[in-house]
Amino acid sequence: MTVAIHTRALHKRYGSHTALHGLDLTVQSGSVFGLIGPNGAGKTTTLRTLLDIIRPTSGDITVLGASPRAGGAALRRRIGYVPGELRLEGRVKGRALLRHLAEISGPVAPGTIEQLAERLGLDLARPVRTLSKGNKQKLGLVQAFMHLPDLLVLDEPTSGLDPLVQREFLAMVREARDAGQTVLLSSHVLSEIQQAADDVAVLAQGRIVAEGPVSSLRIASVRRVRATVTGVAAETVADALAAASGIEDVDVAAAGDLVRVSATARGDIDPVIRAIAAGTIRDLTVEEPDLEESVLDLYARNGAAS
């Protein structure tokens, strides 16, 4: 698999403030890569350096095999971009604006603009200035997707969209990936990353604090384990859990012949299973962690909770 985006030792400073601290990032072609982080983590700065909107203080960047600075207009035509703060010409109608942008971005197949607008529920006949924030966001999505770019760079792309349109957007992202396009998706809506991304990087204070498949973040997270066991004393189970590593919020209670156990496991749940295995396990429930829990836990452990 080829690499669509690669950064090495990427730094960006604004005076005395350092926004990016030596960012090393690799995005494989034909994948959806999620970038998660709180406000001020460096997500937008990262995207803008990839597009040569701002220049890094130091470090190397390669996008679609070229330097963003040297690639110029030819490289930009291969990229679809939705900025976090969308500014559109308000004096024209949506259809006219998109046709004008199509002349800049490159060939757009006949009917594509209308098809995308229909999927997103966008009225192209209305002047842009009369559109709501959500409908302006739909315009931004259409202009990014309409020329079938090799790379989609999407900064908080569902801002202002209702749940049904968000679902359609996620379908568009998956279709783009299936067609061989690469998608870099920056979002604080963690369910989007969970549903759409193959891999993810978590940014905190300009640094990557975790990176890998979305499933790996779930594994690293906190899980709640509940069990009912027999044939063992509650004190024995409680002592075993107290001696195990990575186990928190333990609650062990006897109820007749039953012992009810509840505990939080950080990462692997095996220590909990071992602790209750002295008895007969009658019931066992493991609450699979949501990505949101994983990310909040990572923020907390890296002093970057927001």
Model-found features: residue ranges?
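Alpha-helix N-cap/helix-start and coil->helix boundary motif
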Residues: 11, 95, 190, 234-235, ...
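Structural motif
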Residues: 149, 245-248, 267, 279
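ABC transporter nucleotide-binding domain
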Residues: 169-264
